[in-house]
């Protein structure tokens, strides 16, 4: 017979698996539709019209129209496409289900149109809202927080293709009764994360790792080099942290989301022309292209890092629906490659992984997630001790510093003013 503790853990196992599978399927459907629309906008349509897909006019035109389209969705859809991600953490309170259709449409348009944001925040919002709404109806005795945790874990597993990230994140957030062991509290979320990861793996495999030269034995000087790289990435990220609320406030003085997002899309188009097609979109496929291109110089990597960081700030400040983690990883990779080109004596594995650690730490203020992203992009077990050590001064630098979020004015409603 099972112990009562085991029976308690099993109570939510079936809902956890169902939520994990559903979270992954929602992500897959959204990404497939966005990919098809992206192919239409950036491959088939310019080819039919006889226009180069990297033409400045095409880049500016598509991104401007994308901004206008997203603005129209936010202006006229019920619920105004959910909350502004610039004002929200990755895992937030559930939104009304009526806001989800507009949010999904706004996300798909942004992903396909080349906006420098990832899918993580809107997908998380959608999955949490659905899990809470459906779960509360089917199992009303289970509180909303449990459904929120399960949906968050399933989404994280689906996004990253592994339950490891969910285990790391929730190990520091599930601060329940001290009488309940941590792994008892992690059981159902890990079931959801595993189900989400396995379901995603049936359709596609998230490809984060880069072909970076293998790092051998750790030296004491490598720790110092890694700490300096992380500090440089943090400094760059804190510039973005300073700019985001100020630009957000300035742009939203116009009140009309169609105008705000149209201008934001136009600015993103100009940045895209300067940075080229590799600086567009969420950044995961593009960072693979960046590493594969042997023609890039130190100045090219620097330009890409600056353009992508600026595009991230503009997209978030304008109110596009998307997450900041994936483009931040691109910025970290560009910074790391730039520093390696500038100082070849420091291995690229160190510069890239420590730059990712620093910039993701600024964006998420989550040590485990930052370590995870650095470790999966540069998969090398020799780096793990170094990354853990480098995390310490990086965390000290950011202690008490502002988050990469906008404080919502008290008079503003839960969703964008329109």
From Swiss-Prot:
Signal peptide: none annotated. GO terms for molecular function: chloride transmembrane transporter activity; monoatomic ion channel activity. SUPFAM superfamilies: Clc chloride channel (SSF81340). GO terms for cellular component: plasma membrane. InterPro entries: Chloride_channel_YfeO (IPR022969), Cl-channel_core (IPR014743), ClC (IPR001807), ClC-type_chloride_channel (IPR050368). Keywords: Cell membrane, Ion channel, Ion transport, Membrane, Transmembrane, Transmembrane helix, Transport. The chain crosses the membrane at residues 10-30, 54-74, 99-119, 120-140, 149-169, 186-206, 223-243, 258-278, 300-320, 322-342, 343-363, 371-391. CDD domains: Voltage_gated_ClC. It is a multi-pass membrane protein. It is found in: Cell membrane. Disulfide bonds: none annotated. Belongs to the chloride channel (TC 2.A.49) family. This is Putative ion-transport protein YfeO.
